[in-house]
């Protein structure tokens, strides 16, 4: 006899307002309270606060609530400095004073390393820059309302694809922030605003750079308006049509200088968002790695050469390996530009075993890793085979750092230094650096 499928009835969500006590923050900065012994995550709530919340999601092991009202505020609560805070999905910790933000991030790093790597050491002093005006790059989203034909210009709303209208961003570098209202004014006069993709802003040492992604050809007067704007602000202008080909229309190729090295880049290349913290990060990595003039150093996930090239000025030989072929070519060109002859760069898939690669057959005294958020799980188990006595791991995700650290510890390394870098003030994003050594 055939069974007739009957879908389970959905559990009715109790949406009435409920008062709860917030106990702590999770690793992403959300407050955690408990409702019937189940963790309840509330964005915007702080430890010690009594708040009124409304359930928006309930699972078997956790629930999420919307912050409705704060009955008893924390002493650490501050008024957000940005008028777009409650809409924009960017700076999610503005309601927490900056010192407590740093404390929270350091506690998060230490807790994750203790839980997943079994390591508990004192942290080095955090690496800090300015807490405002620090972002040297941003992607501005564009969207045209089909009913009103109005162009929306700004950043994604929290946990949404919708756009918060933003023409003033306090964490954006002043040289870029001043461009926002003027770019919006120019773009909203375009004949086909629905054919615009997004705007990429980046600040090089030689000035700001504007990149417009567009899906159809622009009219001559539209290009002229953009060129006039860029020229007035001594900015470079790139146009990027559907072919993804970058076309430099005004100005020059952007670059930045780090530890005595000049690094040109295209506006769609990855560079660190916070220049001041990046500079200190490179300096600290070199200090911890301590490359000597008779040593060979391997830089995995090398990108444009942000670490490789400064290290090459101190080591006998540097090998940089990167998974994006275009970046490998640019790193090689950057080495030539800086007259660095002791650095070689290779393209390889660093998400899988690197046995058989020519560069991997060589031995190295020291290794630096700077992977993306996913970490280095594909290759981390092979680090010891490279012969390195010292490994510096730069991470933008403490969870994958903790996971990969366990592998390094299993290979006989000891964690001797650990520190947090506040690359993204007022957000829950956490950059960190760890030093592993073999005795």
UniProtKB/Swiss-Prot annotation:
It comes from the Bacteria. [4Fe-4S] cluster binds at residues 82, 88, 91, 169. Its EC number is 2.1.1.190. GO terms for biological process: rRNA base methylation. The keyword Cell inner membrane does not apply. GO terms for molecular function: 4 iron, 4 sulfur cluster binding; iron ion binding; RNA binding; rRNA (uridine-C5-)-methyltransferase activity. Residues 10-69 form the TRAM domain. Keywords: 4Fe-4S, Iron, Iron-sulfur, Metal-binding, Methyltransferase, rRNA processing, S-adenosyl-L-methionine, Transferase. Catalyzes the formation of 5-methyl-uridine at position 1939 (m5U1939) in 23S rRNA. This is 23S rRNA (uracil(1939)-C(5))-methyltransferase RlmD. It comes from Vibrio parahaemolyticus serotype O3:K6 (strain RIMD 2210633).
């Amino acid at each position: 006899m055939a069974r007739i499928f009957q879908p389970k009835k959905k559990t009715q969500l109790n949406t009435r307002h409920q008062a709860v006590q917030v106990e702590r923050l999770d690793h992403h900065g959300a407050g955690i309270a408990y409702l019937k012994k189940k963790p309840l995550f509330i964005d915007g709530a702080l430890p010690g606060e009594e708040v009124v919340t409304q359930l928006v999601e309930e699972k078997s092991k956790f629930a999420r609530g919307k912050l409705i009202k704060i009955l008893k505020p924390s002493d650490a609560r501050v008024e957000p400095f940005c008028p777009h805070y409650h809409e924009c999905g960017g700076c999610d910790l503005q309601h927490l004073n900056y010192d407590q933000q740093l404390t929270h991030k350091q506690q998060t790093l230490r807790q994750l390393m203790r839980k997943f790597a079994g390591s508990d050491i004192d942290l080095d002093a955090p690496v800090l820059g300015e807490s405002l005006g620090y972002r040297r790059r941003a992607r501005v989203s564009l969207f045209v309302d089909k009913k009103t034909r109005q162009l929306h210009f700004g950043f994604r709303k929290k946990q949404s694809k919708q756009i918060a209208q933003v023409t003033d961003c306090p964490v954006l570098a002043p040289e870029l922030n001043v461009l926002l209202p003027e770019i919006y004014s120019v773009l909203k006069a375009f004949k086909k605003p629905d054919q615009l993709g997004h705007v990429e802003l980046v600040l090089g040492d030689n000035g700001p750079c504007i990149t417009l992604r567009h899906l159809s050809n622009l009219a001559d007067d539209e290009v002229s308006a953009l060129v006039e704007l860029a020229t007035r602000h001594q900015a470079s202008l790139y146009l990027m049509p559907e072919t993804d080909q970058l076309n430099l229309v005004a100005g020059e190729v952007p670059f930045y200088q780090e530890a005595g090295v000049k690094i040109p880049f295209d506006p769609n290349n990855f560079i660190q968002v916070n220049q001041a913290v990046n500079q200190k990060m490179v300096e600290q990595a070199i200090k911890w790695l301590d490359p000597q003039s008779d040593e060979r150093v391997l830089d995995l996930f090398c990108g444009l050469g942000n670490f490789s090239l400064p290290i090459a000025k101190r080591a006998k030989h540097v090998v940089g390996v990167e998974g994006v072929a275009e970046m490998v070519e640019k790193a090689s060109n950057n080495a030539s530009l800086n007259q660095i002859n002791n650095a070689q760069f290779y393209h390889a898939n660093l998400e899988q075993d690197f046995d058989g690669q020519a560069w991997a057959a060589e031995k190295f005294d020291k290794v630096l890793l700077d992977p993306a958020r996913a970490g280095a799980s594909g290759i981390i188990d092979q680090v010891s085979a490279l012969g390195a006595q010292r490994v510096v791991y730069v991470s933008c995700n403490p969870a994958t750092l903790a996971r990969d650290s366990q592998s390094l510890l299993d290979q006989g390394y000891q964690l001797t230094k650990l520190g947090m870098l506040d690359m993204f003030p007022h957000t829950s994003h956490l950059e960190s650096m760890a030093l592993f050594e073999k005795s």
